[in-house]
């Protein structure tokens, strides 16, 4: 039976849910507070890492589920959204051993490389004590991906409304009512809340068990070098030669070689944040590049900002209570899974079970 579904939020998670719900024949309307392609949240920019390499097998399985969906999205939208680049993980050998084990079990084995082999293949990148190369990784074109998701949903009948903030969600009978700041009341069979760092507002009063969400302003940088698109994605895990908590990630993009610290930014209010670059954060990344990225020598980094919305255990929230499904807590690593998360949301809207790892009210310890 086709349902009337309101999706609150048109970033990665909301757009993914809209596409997969509309693909199943549901009548979908997306309510996006800001304008098309806005830079107020976590889904903007030119690049995100796609990778299969995770220490937790469930995430590798989820990435494998997302991969054919990204390709299907490209076919439906006519847009290229995922470019294969391969990826290099380097750092403590025990970390790489675990990644290699998970990849091998998934039938996607990586290749171990010495620092010298890394330097020979990618002269711009200096590896730590050991490295693991996995060819199935790539670069997701973030802005294009969100636009493609909404476009593909629209081709299947979904409507997208920009402007107007959702002020309240109420359960009504077997469905829900969404109230906007224009005093408009919209009634639906189901509501999907996918508003990133703003989730505690609309979700208040209609779901319980939402974990604390830590909203931070992150500050990656681009080094504008001409060969940026030839670089692999890379993750430098802390320990061994790196003492930055959370490690450093990087990848090539049309804007240059992008690097950033994982979850190292200050806590902010998503409605009231200063986007002025933090000189100390910029210096940390500049110092890192001087030691580990000889390929960007002589270029000045260009900073940008975005939001992380992080749960205590860095697992996502994807769960339903009644007619309301919540997608939140991307925790700085959700983009690669986008369409697969949309599938999980569609399952929940249709009454299917969720994954315990992503449940509301879970008691997983903080990492």
Q: Regions from the language model: what does each represent?
A:
Residues 1-13:
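Beta1/beta-strand and adjacent pyrophosphate-binding region of the FAD-binding site
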Residues 8, 185-198, 342:
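Short hydrophobic core segments
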Residues 19-23, 80-82, 197-322:
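Active-site substrate-recognition segment that forms the wall
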Residues 47-121, 128-130, 247-248:
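Dinucleotide-binding Rossmann-like beta1-alpha1 core, especially the glycine-rich loop
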């Amino acid at each position: 039976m086709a349902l009337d579904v309101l999706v609150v939020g048109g970033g990665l998670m909301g757009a993914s849910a809209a596409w997969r719900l509309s693909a199943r024949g549901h009548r979908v309307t997306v309510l996006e507070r800001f304008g098309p392609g806005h830079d107020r949240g976590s889904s903007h920019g030119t690049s995100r890492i796609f990778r299969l390499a995770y220490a937790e097998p469930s995430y590798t399985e989820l990435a494998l589920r997302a991969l054919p969906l990204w390709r299907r999205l490209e076919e439906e939208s006519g847009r290229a959204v995922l470019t294969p680049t391969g990826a290099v993980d380097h750092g403590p050998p025990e970390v790489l051993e675990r990644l290699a084990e998970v990849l091998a079990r998934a039938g996607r084995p990586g290749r171990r490389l010495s620092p010298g082999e890394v330097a020979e293949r990618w002269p711009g990148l200096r590896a730590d004590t050991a490295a693991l190369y996995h060819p199935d990784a790539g670069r997701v074109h973030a802005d294009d991906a969100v636009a493609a998701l909404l476009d593909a949903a629209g081709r299947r009948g979904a409507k997208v409304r920009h402007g107007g903030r959702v002020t309240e969600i109420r359960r009504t009978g077997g469905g829900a009512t969404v109230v906007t700041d224009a005093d408009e009341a919209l009634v639906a069979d189901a509501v999907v809340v996918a508003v990133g760092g703003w989730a505690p507002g609309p979700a208040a009063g209609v779901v319980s068990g939402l974990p604390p969400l830590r909203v931070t302003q992150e500050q990656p940088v681009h080094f504008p070098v001409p060969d940026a698109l030839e670089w692999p994605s890379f993750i430098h895990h802390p320990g061994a030669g790196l003492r930055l908590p959370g490690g450093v990630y990087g990848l090539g993009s049309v804007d240059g070689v992008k690097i950033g610290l994982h979850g190292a930014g200050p806590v902010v209010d998503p409605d009231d944040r200063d986007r002025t670059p933090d000189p100390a954060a910029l210096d940390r990344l500049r110092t890192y590049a001087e030691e580990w990225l000889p390929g960007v020598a002589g270029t000045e980094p260009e900073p940008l900002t975005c939001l992380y919305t992080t749960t205590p255990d860095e697992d996502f929230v994807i769960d339903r209570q009644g007619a309301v499904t919540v997608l939140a807590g991307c925790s700085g690593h959700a983009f690669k899974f986008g369409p697969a998360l949309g599938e999980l949301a569609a399952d929940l809207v249709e009454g299917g079970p969720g994954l315990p790892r992503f449940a509301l009210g879970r008691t997983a310890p903080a990492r």
